[in-house]
């Protein structure tokens, strides 16, 4: 795990999962070209939300249709072709997988008959998901790419109320060189801590970085893991300056008195707060651009050449001065 994650530069940018494009080829070109850690996007406008993409049009049964086993993401073929044509420089890509707990909760909620044991259903789904993910990870390995698998669990708190336990992810943990958890809702930090993922991705804009979060992220860093800060919202873009402020505040909170803020930043990645499948394409492009500018400012890199309206030189100077004060 460690060697793969150490290939990623501090404050590497990535997307969460869904994108607002209708055509897989357009979505994939953006996911590979606009982010430093490319990812295979979900396309809710064309194929339904993250649950429908995996469960299909009839998720109303507590079971698994034959065509769901080893199902590939809708953009998969285009993604593989794109990363072969334009491989990431560090040889790492990300797969975002709808989590077994979220799928189990969805199946239970939509079924005409109640599923009596959601945790058992989630473990069964996890096995099926792991089979599909293992195939995808092997395909990417065959073209020289290592894969970070991030399990997307927006239904985590609901699953916890149903009695689910962290062992549900064991099959997915074993399916990739490194694995993580993304939670766009309220985060049960003790549960995430006990699960010991290699990467934690969450919405720091909405949920902040309280003591429970700080303790969990410190332990994550001691294991050589990474935190993906969800620091920008495509619905209400704020620009790179506020992203820089937000990342620095979270890093200082985790560092406390015993760590260096720079060490926390070294273990950080940047993303939006959630997938942007419900946003406009222009908003997603701006989000990716703002994240990239913020990352370059925080790292002290030369500003990248991105297709965007020119920023005033005084704005850039203010940003650089703020970072220099860390």
Write out the residue ranges for each language-model feature.
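Hydrophobic beta-strand scaffold residues
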Residues: 179, 226-228
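A short acidic, amphipathic alpha-helical/loop segment
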Residues: 27, 31, 190-195, 212-220
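A short, acidic, amphipathic alpha-helical segment used as a generic capping/interface helix at domain edges
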Residues: 210-219, 240-263
């Amino acid at each position: 795990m460690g060697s793969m994650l150490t290939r990623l530069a501090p404050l590497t940018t990535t997307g969460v999962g869904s994108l607002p494009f209708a055509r897989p080829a357009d979505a994939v070109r953006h996911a590979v070209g606009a982010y430093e850690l490319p990812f295979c996007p979900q396309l809710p406008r064309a194929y339904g939300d993250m649950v429908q993409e995996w469960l299909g049009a009839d998720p109303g049964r507590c079971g698994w249709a034959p065509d769901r086993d080893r199902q590939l993401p809708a953009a998969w073929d285009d993604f593989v072709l794109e990363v072969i044509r334009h491989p990431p420089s560090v040889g790492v890509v990300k797969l975002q997988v709808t989590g077994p707990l979220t799928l189990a909760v969805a199946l239970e909620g939509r079924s005409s008959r109640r599923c009596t044991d959601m945790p058992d259903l989630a473990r069964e789904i996890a096995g099926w998901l792991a089979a599909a993910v293992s195939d995808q990870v092997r395909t990417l390995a065959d073209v020289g790419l290592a894969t970070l698998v991030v399990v997307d669990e927006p239904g985590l708190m609901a699953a916890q109320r149903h009695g689910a336990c962290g062992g549900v992810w064991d099959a997915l943990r074993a399916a990739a060189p490194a694995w993580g958890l993304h939670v766009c809702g309220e985060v049960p930090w003790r549960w995430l801590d006990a699960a010991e993922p290699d990467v934690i991705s969450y919405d720091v804009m909405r949920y902040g970085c309280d003591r429970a979060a700080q303790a969990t992220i410190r332990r994550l860093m001691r294991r050589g893991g990474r935190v993906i800060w969800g620091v920008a919202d495509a619905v209400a873009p704020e620009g790179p300056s506020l992203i820089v402020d937000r990342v620095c505040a979270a890093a200082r909170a985790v560092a406390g008195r015993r760590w260096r803020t720079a060490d926390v930043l070294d273990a950080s990645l940047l993303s939006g707060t959630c997938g942007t499948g419900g946003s406009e394409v222009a908003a997603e492009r701006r989000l990716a651009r703002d994240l990239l500018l913020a990352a370059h400012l925080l790292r002290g890199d030369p500003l990248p050449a991105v297709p965007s309206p020119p920023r005033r030189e005084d704005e850039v100077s203010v940003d650089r001065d703020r970072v220099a004060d860390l």
